[in-house]
């Protein structure tokens, strides 16, 4: 059994601590491989401490699509992503720290009513009022606002898009028209 730093190192996947790095370091790590933003942010070998819930919130705050590839981001998008990552993590760490001081949490959940998009499928986006969309895959889902993050494009959900085939709605307008058929 290893103790101290050696013990921690054996289970640490090695991702950077966003609050302890600068924009250049953040960008360098996330562009090592050309991945989608969602996948890059949730890979603990790249970034430490960002899971499914916080990645949804970060991408919404940055107004970036979860399926944009890291090597396609423009400088101003990197600025927004880095700022949103730091501010989202800081805000939630502060909030959770205060909650823990008040009382020990009775249940731990990734779905919080204060979230903007995560776990809020079909509820209104707090920024624009459009319904939050989702992409389901395996045991996870990605939540996003099509208006704020994808310029109105509805991203394909593997299970539903296979079922609907060519009838899959590509935009918010097409989705609304489909609902009124």
Language model segments and positions:
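Phosphate/anion-contacting hairpin/loop surfaces
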Residues: 1-64, 69-72, 76, 81-82
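Gly/Gly-Pro- and Ser/Thr-rich, intrinsically disordered tail segments characteristic of DNA damage-repair
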Residues: 1-2, 20, 162-166, 171-181
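Short cysteine-rich clusters marking metal-coordination/redox-active sites
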Residues: 125-128, 145-148
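Short, flexible, mixed-charge glycine/proline-rich loop motifs
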Residues: 112-121, 135-138
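Short metal-coordination and nucleic-acid-contact micro-motifs, chiefly zinc-binding Cys/His arrays
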Residues: 43, 118-122, 141-144
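Short Cys/His-rich Zn2+-coordinating modules
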Residues: 102-116, 126-130
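Short metal-binding segments enriched for Cys and/or His
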Residues: 151-166
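Short functional micro-motifs and their immediate structural scaffolds
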Residues: 132-133, 153
């Amino acid at each position: 059994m290893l103790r101290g730093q050696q013990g921690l190192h054996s289970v640490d996947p090695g991702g950077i601590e966003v609050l302890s790095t600068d924009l250049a370091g953040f960008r360098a790590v996330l562009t090592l491989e050309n991945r989608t933003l969602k996948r890059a942010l949730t890979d603990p070998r790249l970034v430490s401490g960002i899971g499914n819930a916080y990645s949804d919130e970060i991408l919404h705050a940055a107004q970036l699509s979860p399926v944009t590839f890291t090597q396609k981001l423009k400088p101003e998008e990197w600025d927004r992503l880095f700022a949103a990552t730091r501010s989202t993590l800081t805000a939630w760490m502060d909030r959770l720290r205060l909650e823990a001081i008040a009382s020990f949490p009775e249940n731990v959940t990734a779905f919080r009513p204060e979230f903007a998009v995560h776990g809020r499928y079909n509820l209104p986006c707090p920024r624009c009022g459009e319904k939050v969309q989702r992409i389901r895959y395996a045991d996870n889902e990605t939540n996003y606002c099509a208006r704020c993050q994808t310029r109105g494009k509805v991203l394909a959900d593997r299970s539903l898009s296979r079922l609907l085939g060519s009838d899959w709605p590509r935009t918010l307008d097409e989705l609304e028209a489909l609902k009124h058929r």
